[in-house]
A protein has these predicted regions:
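Alpha-helical transmembrane segments used as membrane anchors
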Residues: 1-188
Length: 188
């Protein structure tokens, strides 16, 4: 299979995953039959992704809460990453970063007590555990800094470029240079 076809297929797969997650999470209803409750009185599932989407959304909200929405961002980022030529093959580190980011975000929503749907079980465990060690404000500060650091390394952000307005320009220039190099290799 050619490199271009492989990239296209991977991009489509990641975007389909993102779309299914959006459909599942946005149309979540506690009335749908799912993992945490069975409702035989409902003849029609209201989740846009069907019964599977109702189950998926219920499991994600039960365990991760609002941090489940990071999965959509991650799927879109991975779809974009497929086309980047400057990405180092550090998939395992990026995967660990995703996990830490989701757990820290769940913990943050647990500390902020946005409710059961927002924090999930993991958020409640992490938030309560850290609050008993660091107090409320210490936990809040720790998780915010941890999330910022995790986002920086996981998504390969350079804050100096972002704050100075150079991020988009330098990314576009790097992509153009990579495309020129790839086109030169194809012609040769």
């Amino acid at each position: 299979m050619s490199y271009y076809i492989r990239q296209s297929v991977l991009t489509i797969i990641w975007l389909i995953v993102a779309l299914l997650l959006v459909m599942s999470l946005i149309s979540y209803s506690a009335n749908d039959p799912s993992w945490s409750h069975i409702n035989s009185a409902v003849n029609e599932v209201s989740n846009l992704a069907g019964t599977g989407g109702a189950w998926l959304a219920d499991i994600l909200y039960a365990f991760l809460g609002a941090a489940s929405w990071w999965l959509i961002v991650i799927a879109c980022y991975e779809a974009w990453n497929v086309w980047r030529h400057d990405v180092e093959p550090n998939g395992l580190l990026r995967f660990l970063g995703y996990i830490f980011l989701i757990i820290a975000t769940a913990g943050l929503t647990g500390v902020l007590s946005f409710g059961w749907l927002a924090q999930g079980m993991i958020g409640q465990i992490v938030g309560n555990g850290l609050s008993s060690l660091l107090t409320y404000w210490g936990t809040l500060l720790f998780l915010l800094v941890f999330i910022a650091i995790t986002v920086t390394f996981t998504f390969d952000l350079h804050w100096h470029e972002i704050l100075s307005g150079q991020a988009i320009r330098s990314r576009l220039q790097a992509e153009a240079a990579d495309d020129d190099e790839a086109n030169t290799k194809l012609k040769a």
